From Swiss-Prot:
Pfam family, one: Ilm1
Lineage top rank: taxon: Eukaryota
Coiled-coil annotated spans: none
Protein name: Protein ilm1
Amino acid sequence: MLFSFRAIVLFYCCMLTFAGIGFLWNPKFVVESGLVALIGASMEVKPLIVTQDNLSTLALSGLVFLILGMIYTISLLQSNFLFFSGITPIRAIFDFILTGFIYLKKEHIASNSLTFTFAFCDLMWQFWMFAAMSEERAKYLKNQKKAEELAARKAREVEES
C-alpha cells in the first residue's frame, strides 16, 4: 500500500475536522467550493444554495463532522482496530446507498451537490481504508495469536507451580 492504514485514517480525521470547522465558521465557503461544484455538475445534481434558513442545518452538519473526527481520532490513538474493521464496511454500504439514492432521485430535498459530494468522497475514503486494512488485520491477528500463546504459557506455569 502506498500509505499506511494509520496515515489514511489520520488524514480522514483531518478532513472531517476541517469540514466541521468550515461548516461552523463559513458554510458558504464549503458549499461553494470547487470540488462540490465539480462533482455536483458532473452528476447533474442541483447545487445547494446557502440561505438563512439552512444555516442551522449546516451548523449541525459541522458538529456531526467534528464529532466523527474526534471519534475516529480517539479510536486511532487507542489503536482500536476492531472499531475500524466493524464500522468501515457499514459506512461504505451506507455511502453507496446514499450516493445511488441521490443520483436516482434528483428531485428529493436531500439530493444536492453538497450531499452527493460528501457521500461520494466518504465512499472513496471508506474503500481506501478497507483496502489498507488488510495489512493492519494481519498485524492484529498476529498480535492476538501471540497474546493467546503467552496466556496459555502463563496458565501452564501456574498449573506446574
